[in-house]
Amino acid sequence: EGNCYGIIGANGAGKSTFLKILSGELEPTQGDISITPGQRLSVLEQDHFKYDDCIVLDTVIMGNQRLYDIMKEKDAIYAKEDFTEEDGIRASELEGEFATMNGWEAESDAATLLNGLNIDTELHYKKMSELSGSEKVKVLLARALFGNPDILLLDEPTNHLDLDAIRWLEEFLINFENTIIVVSHDRYFLNKVCTHTVDIDYA
């Protein structure tokens, strides 16, 4: 915990593939990937159009999918006109889990991340499709950082970021208390945030 592992290497050496294997997006050709049960892994999404139909603030909170699912299920239960005793029991269970996950702070935490990355408050309730390409990148980065994940996988996180956003990200990662694995061509950035660095060569 508290370590940041930087991965460098030539284009095509397998850096991004390695992260996809760690995240479970790709199967390893040999060996196994083991993550401690209960630990949450968060990945910087590379598909900039995946959340185009979603509200910006919701997109960030989706970084903790379980928390987002609880919020949606709670809303659906409370919106029912024929609220039953079973609904009340289920709502109580969800409220307990929601509180344990600091759900009441979710929107303010998401907004703090967005503001840190210079996404204006007026954009927080717009659809992702209304944002520019660079704004989308920042929202997806905030999504990856949201909710204090146990393991954070970042593939070229400084791409398309302005200098202020890069400096903010550096400070965030330096103070991050869990495990980070980051691929970047920005050696200065890696030197700032990483406790360890590995150079991947061609197999």
Where are these regions (language model features)?
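ABC ATP-binding cassette signature C-motif
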Residues: 1-203
